[in-house]
Amino acid sequence: MAKPLKIMVFGDSLVAGFGLPPGEAFPDILAQKLSQYGYQNEMINAGVSGDTTAGGVTRIDWALADKPDVVVLVLGGNDMLRGLRPAASEQNLRIILTRLADEGVPVLFCGMLAPENLGADYAAEFNPLYPRLADEFNTSFIPFFLQDVALVPALNQPDGLHPNRAGIDVIVQNLMPELLVLLASRGEQKG
């Protein structure tokens, strides 16, 4: 029997499971879905509520001590909500992606999109940084982590920012095709 696939989801409150009951955070549901597809897995929830890309830089080496086989990277939403300079966010994400590449860890990189209320200029600077980095590092890529969930009240908690369980299900469903391709391309074994 193949050893379980060690998958780390590295990110912020969208990963940590802010406002969700235990066992219903994104990594938990992702682990269940992977098991349904035949991938035995050990899921590591490396989500920290409120984390920024700068925070991610400070803890990536610590996180890599767990020796993940694959990393799902979901960071930058808090940078955006705080109006931090997109160039700084991009540089921080580049540092994290470089560390993952140095360790030979394949990445499913999940992008964020700035909402219109932050202004067209900010969005024009922030939104392209994710596809640019995905190209630079040749990672598997999800252009918008909250695709089909953002701004849909029925799929979010009352704060309008964090997905509820139904929203998590949509996110996992959207991510699975890209993650399955990544795992297959790495020759990861089911079982």
Where are these regions (language model features)?
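Acidic-and-aromatic substrate-binding clefts and catalytic sites of carbohydrate-active enzymes
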Residues: 50-54
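Serine-esterase "nucleophile elbow" of acetyl-processing enzymes
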Residues: 1-49, 59-67
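Alpha-helical cap/lid subdomain in secreted, periplasmic
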Residues: 29-39, 55-191
